[in-house]
């Protein structure tokens, strides 16, 4: 298994990531095509990366990371869309991605990795706790623009 950063767009990679995001979705619904421009923005940004875990020539997991900055926090890493293929869960791919995420955050000079996890996701919450993450008591808000 190898973990790399996305460095170029291809329709095949975009489709596989779309399949993985369906596995992540609570509803199991396909949210549609991921635009090529999104991939290009990630590839060209020094503050964002998409980590890809591959095994046997197939993408088995992804993690999308960003650096967030503020005067009170300085620099933190933020994790969005971390998923492994449901057919291979429990085989270490998520753990390998997790370690690579922590390394990525350290390389960027971040103090911590922050993320959200839905209330009904017991397996994901257990994974995070088993890997040293702690629940931080806060409310997460969203406002559509």
Where would I find each of the regions flagged by the language model?
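A cytosolic small-molecule/anion-sensing beta-strand core signal
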Residues: 55, 80, 86
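Conserved active-site alpha-helix within GNAT-family acetyltransferase domains
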Residues: 95, 107, 119-143
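Conserved GNAT acetyl-CoA-binding A-motif
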Residues: 98, 105-116
């Amino acid at each position: 298994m190898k973990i790399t950063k996305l460095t170029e767009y291809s329709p095949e990679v975009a489709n596989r990531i779309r399949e993985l995001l369906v596995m992540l979705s609570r509803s199991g619904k396909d949210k549609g095509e991921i635009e090529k421009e999104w991939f290009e923005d990630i590839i060209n940004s020094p503050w964002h990366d998409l980590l890809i875990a591959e095994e046997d020539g197939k993408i088995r997991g992804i993690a999308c990371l960003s650096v967030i900055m503020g005067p009170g926090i300085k620099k933190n890493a933020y994790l969005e869309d971390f998923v492994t293929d449901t057919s291979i869960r429990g085989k270490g791919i998520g753990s390998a991605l997790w370690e690579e995420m922590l390394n990525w955050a350290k390389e960027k000079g971040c103090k911590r990795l922050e993320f959200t996890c839905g209330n009904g996701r017991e397996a994901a919450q257990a994974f995070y706790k088993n890997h040293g993450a702690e629940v931080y008591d806060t409310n997460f808000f969203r406002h559509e623009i």
